Regions:
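Short helix-initiation/N-cap motifs at beta->coil->alpha
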Residues: 28-35, 107-122
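C-terminal lobe and pocket-closing loops
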Residues: 133-147, 158-215
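A structural signal for short loop-to-beta-strand junctions that line the ligand-binding cleft
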Residues: 1-16, 47, 152-157, 161-165
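Glycine-centered hinge/linker elements that transmit conformational signals in sensory
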Residues: 36-41, 79-110, 155
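Short helix-loop capping/hinge motifs at secondary-structure junctions, enriched
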Residues: 15-25, 43, 74-75, 101-102, ...
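Paired acidic/hydrophobic, glycine-rich loop segments that form the ligand-binding mouth/hinge
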Residues: 126-131
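Extracytoplasmic/periplasmic solute-binding protein
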Residues: 1-3, 8, 32-82, 125
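Short, solvent-exposed loop/beta-turn-alpha elements that line the ligand-binding surface or hinge
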Residues: 26, 53-56, 71-91, 140-145, ...
């Protein structure tokens, strides 16, 4: 039973965008993102953009796949021939490296979700493109110094709108050989029910409800 789902999106400092005189579109392009990053980049106080740079499939490659997609690239062609040396891949990687080199924080190659979350909550990131779950943390005044200055937009586009954001899902299952199958099944049913969702929302707020089930 699915209990959690997320996508990716743009999270940005609306106060900095307003100060720069830039209105962020609901569906921005990567050209828009680069222009805004240049305007609000003010190190060491604020870095124009923060992106995952730590190597790994669940790290920078999760993000890079969406960037390559929007440049019109793909991992394989229809004959399963790798496309890593194609022009869209080269364009996307060059854009990514230049963006972080010019407008990202120092040490970006070691940053993944948790490192960037800490930077964002300290007010060090002007923009961040990452998992939608981050909204729960960066809008929480108990965790974030800029909770009241955050705005959101869809994943940036470039040559195409296809694949501009990712989609992940997690699910609960009961193993066939479990000794307490009935109890486990009842728990899974409850933990994925509207009753559970409303209970969490009432107890601790909608921001703590599993993503993909929020109002």
């Amino acid at each position: 039973a699915p209990f959690y789902g997320e996508s990716s999106m743009l999270m940005y400092r609306k106060d900095l965008a307003d100060k720069a005189g830039i209105t962020v579109a609901d569906k921005p392009t990567w050209t828009d993102i680069k222009a805004l990053a240049a305007k609000i980049h003010n190190p060491p106080n604020v870095y124009g953009i923060c992106l995952r740079g730590k190597p790994g499939w669940g790290d920078n490659m999760a993000f890079l796949s969406t960037l390559v997609n929007t440049h019109g690239g793909q991992w394989f062609d229809m004959s399963w021939k790798p496309q890593l040396e194609s022009k869209p891949w080269k364009d996307a990687i060059t854009f990514y490296v230049d963006l972080l080199k010019n407008y990202g924080p120092p040490g970006s190659s070691a940053n993944s979700f948790n490192e960037i979350l800490a930077l964002y909550n300290e007010g060090k990131c002007g923009m961040w493109i990452d998992a939608t779950i981050a909204a729960s943390f960066i809008t929480d005044p108990k965790q974030s110094k800029v909770a009241d200055k955050v705005a959101f937009a869809q994943g940036p586009q470039m040559a195409t709108t296809k694949g501009a954001n990712w989609l992940w899902a997690w699910a609960l299952a009961v193993p066939a050989g479990t000794k307490n199958a009935d109890a486990a099944q009842k728990f899974v049913t409850w933990a994925t029910s509207k009753e559970y969702i409303n209970l969490i929302a009432k107890s601790t707020g909608w921001a703590t409800v599993p993503t993909g089930t929020r109002k």
